Amino acid sequence: MSNISRQAYADMFGPTTGDKIRLADTELWIEVEDDLTTYGEEVKFGGGKVIRDGMGQGQMLSAGCADLVLTNALIIDYWGIVKADIGVKDGRIFAIGKAGNPDIQPNVTIPIGVSTEIIAAEGRIVTAGGVDTHIHWICPQQAEEALTSGITTMIGGGTGPTAGSNATTCTPGPWYIYQMLQAADSLPVNIGLLGKGNCSNPDALREQVAAGVIGLKIHEDWGATPAVINCALTVADEMDVQVALHSDTLNESGFVEDTLTAIGGRTIHTFHTEGAGGGHAPDIITACAHPNILPSSTNPTLPYTVNTIDEHLDMLMVCHHLDPDIAEDVAFAESRIRQETIAAEDVLHDLGAFSLTSSDSQAMGRVGEVVLRTWQVAHRMKVQRGPLPEESGDNDNVRVKRYIAKYTINPALTHGIAHEVGSIEVGKLADLVLWSPAFFGVKPATIVKGGMIAMAPMGDINGSIPTPQPVHYRPMFAALGSARHRCRVTFLSQAAAANGVAEQLNLHSTTAVVKGCRTVQKADMRHNSLLPDITVDSQTYEVRINGELITSEPADILPMAQRYFLF
């Protein structure tokens, strides 16, 4: 076999085992751990290339070959950083390995035939579509904005720009649940709705779950009392759905200890666990120490910068229907914004004590920045804290796996949808995001939804080639017509599926049920399962783990920022 230089190989087929790649303009470097393609037998499409009839393409019928192959992809997922071909069949991942013609090539696990389409992933990073679990359904255009950032699944509640939806992620009652399920049937992303969990009558919660929501949201603006928390968790345990909690900032109905007592060791997803987004002041952050608490952040406080504190007061006043002329409203808002706990939040993510990131879309958070801000935090922590002690070798692979899990597999596990989405694994929906390494986390090169391209940057439609300016993101065929129904999923509760809600509402999209919501624990959070001994000083708000002060310096400059948005 002839040899070529490592540089020439990377230029032709993408990086291979041992090669290092910088992520965007951050200080994060990954190293390829394994290469599942076979040296000398790589497949590539194009003039004079391998994927031609009788060469890398076989003669089998469609039943015996992939519908789509992503060739020579560099996969970043919680389970590894690996070079491989990815095979897709019927909208799902059916193999990760070596593509080609099994009649003449060795080690082929993904047959290529005349029915196979090719996406050239040489020199591209491929990640699973992101899962955002904190969506305020204020406007439907959020779906396209999220999709262009690499988010393919959106979980939350709302009914449009109402006072309730501007502040809380709740779709209240069967009538609104039905309307929102029908409205979402045409969105180009997977969705799951959260009902309003603020009720101490279990029947009022059961009917919402039976109508189709996949979880119940408890929000302080509707009253997050111990009775409400206990009732929602009781119904959730009965019907296998998740409960999401925005707890009582004002400590009116109890303190964080009372909320934990009401939770009673049952699984619960705590939203914006730092507290600037809401929750017991000043110590809701201590909830991350408990094995049944699945703690997440929303992106307004990520990463901590010199502008974070100043930005929050006005955002909070608008989103939570507060009046700047009422002193009590201003005091409420100010009680949630604490520099000390915000400064600790990034570190808790880096330690793996906080397990998820999400947006809080149009309700203090930015729906198109979950991916970007997650990686900005990872960069800041690398710069401030150095390599993680778990790292082996001159790379950031452990840190990268920790951070990618925060918006892919961990939210999917938390909300009972990991059997369908959240990672690049066989059997799951082919929701895949391709990135040029230089634009990683900022601007995807291609977004594949259910095995078909749903969104991509596209140039002048009257151009002679696809690339002339102006180039901007445009919906592709997976987002149009009846194809979008086959390429997306609406998640329902098991009760709603049993009741035939999809048929009653004449939903056209594929549906899937959530499961395992009540058994998932912090220990199941991939790379993010630390249970710290954490305290907050009630006077100074200083956060300590095992007595050691946990803080970080605010950033005055960030990667993945202005230089990427000049065009």
From Swiss-Prot:
Q: Which residues carry this modification: N6-carboxylysine?
A: K217
Q: Where does substrate bind?
A: H219
The UniProt keywords, alphabetically, are: Cytoplasm, Hydrolase, Metal-binding, Nickel
Q: Which Gene3D superfamilies match?
A: Metal-dependent hydrolases, Urease, subunit C, domain 1
Task: Give the note describing cofactor binding and stoichiometry.
Answer: Binds 2 nickel ions per subunit.
Q: Where is the active site?
A: H320
| CC cofactor | Ni cation
**Which Gene Ontology terms describe the biological processes this protein takes part in?**
urea catabolic process
Quaternary organization: Heterotrimer of UreA (gamma), UreB (beta) and UreC (alpha) subunits. Three heterotrimers associate to form the active enzyme.
Q: Detail which positions bind Ni(2+) 2.
A: K217, H246, H272
Q: Which family does it belong to?
A: Belongs to the metallo-dependent hydrolases superfamily. Urease alpha subunit family.
PANTHER family, alphabetized: UREASE
Q: Which organism is it from?
A: Escherichia coli O157:H7
| Pathway the protein takes part in | Nitrogen metabolism; urea degradation; CO(2) and NH(3) from urea (urease route): step 1/1
What is the protein's name according to its record? Answer: Urease subunit alpha
